[in-house]
Regions:
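Membrane-interface alpha-helices at helix entry/exit sites of multi-pass transporters
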Residues: 55-57, 84-85, 154-161
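Small-polar-interrupted transmembrane alpha-helices in polytopic inner-membrane proteins
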Residues: 87-106, 158-174
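Hydrophobic alpha-helical transmembrane segments
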Residues: 60-76, 135-146
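N-terminal transmembrane-helix/juxtamembrane module of multi-pass inner/ER membrane proteins
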Residues: 1-67, 99-128, 263-270
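Alpha-helical transmembrane segments
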Residues: 16-30, 89-93, 163-168, 221-226
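Loop-to-helix transition at the N-terminal end of transmembrane alpha-helices
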Residues: 46-61, 87-90, 184-189, 243-248
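Interfacial segments of alpha-helical transmembrane regions
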Residues: 15-19, 72-96, 160
């Protein structure tokens, strides 16, 4: 991509705006912890659940990193359009989230409040680091990429707001299933803005799209879709509806892999 002065100024503005959002999320999240609003908020949510457990189980699936990767890759018109940005965000996000969890291992809600005080849905993790929420990061980063690309294509503004609202709901599902504190989700949202902005700037300077649109890139994408399909074949929910939906996503990933194989074979004959 171009590295003109216009892009440099734009990049600085993006990073400055994202810095403000990240600081707000960090201050808000830390304040919830310091003033013990985290526990009060968590208990109120689980004391009187508004929506059924199967609903949160289904929504929670959309925050899975592999599901998010599938959604983004399938949303491309053709391989190599925004694949580079997607993969950079996915890889950088995984690294940032796991690093923060390792450096600041905050206990999960069930370890502090007790499992009997929460409505735990689909056996959420109990012992790994709680902050930040990887699902919240994945959902928001997915929405940011989709909204950015769709806005450039001139998609109606109302659809963009719907994507943003759904991403917020997916993020909040981590609190509803008992896996994360509200502060974890808020910090995950802030981190998503930061990583997506950094990878966007990275993409404007050095893109992998040319290689990813080649025959070798197609092989990599076929491998990725195959891994996604294998991952999704393992049920992650106790609810049959969610299991069926998860299986349909696995089939979608296999279909995309087959399509890419056909494209790769066509490239070899040209």
């Amino acid at each position: 991509m171009s590295t003109s002065a216009t892009h440099v100024v734009s990049s600085k503005r993006i990073l400055l705006s994202v810095g403000v959002i990240l600081c707000f999320c960090l201050v808000f999240g830390v304040s919830l912890i310091i003033f013990e609003f985290n526990q009060q908020w968590m208990l109120r949510i689980h004391l009187d659940p508004i929506l059924p457990n199967w609903f949160w189980s289904l929504i929670n699936l959309f925050g899975d990193a592999w599901v998010v990767l599938l959604i983004l890759l399938v949303s491309e018109r053709r391989p190599g359009v925004m694949t580079s940005w997607i993969l950079k965000t996915w890889l950088a996000g995984a690294a940032f989230v796991q690093l923060i969890k390792y450096l600041s291992p905050m206990p999960r809600p069930a370890n502090v409040l007790g499992k009997e005080m929460l409505t735990l849905i689909d056996h959420p993790p109990l012992f790994s680091g709680s902050m930040p929420s990887g699902h919240a990061f994945a959902a928001i980063s997915c929405a940011l990429i989709l909204v950015t690309v769709m806005k450039q294509r001139g998609v109606n503004q109302s659809y963009l707001w719907m994507i943003a609202a759904f991403a917020g709901l997916v993020s909040w599902a981590r609190v509803a299933v008992g896996a994360h504190w509200p502060s974890d989700v808020i910090v995950g949202v802030g981190l998503a803005f930061l990583v997506v902005a950094l990878t966007y700037v990275w993409e404007t300077r050095s893109s992998w799209n040319h290689w990813l649109s080649s025959k070798h890139g197609a092989v990599l994408l076929v491998l990725i879709h195959s891994l996604i399909a294998v991952y999704l074949l393992v049920p992650q929910s106790d609810f049959l509806l969610v299991q069926i939906f998860q299986l349909s996503l696995a089939c979608l990933s296999v279909s995309k892999a087959i399509y890419l194989i056909k494209v790769s074979l066509w490239l070899r004959t040209t």
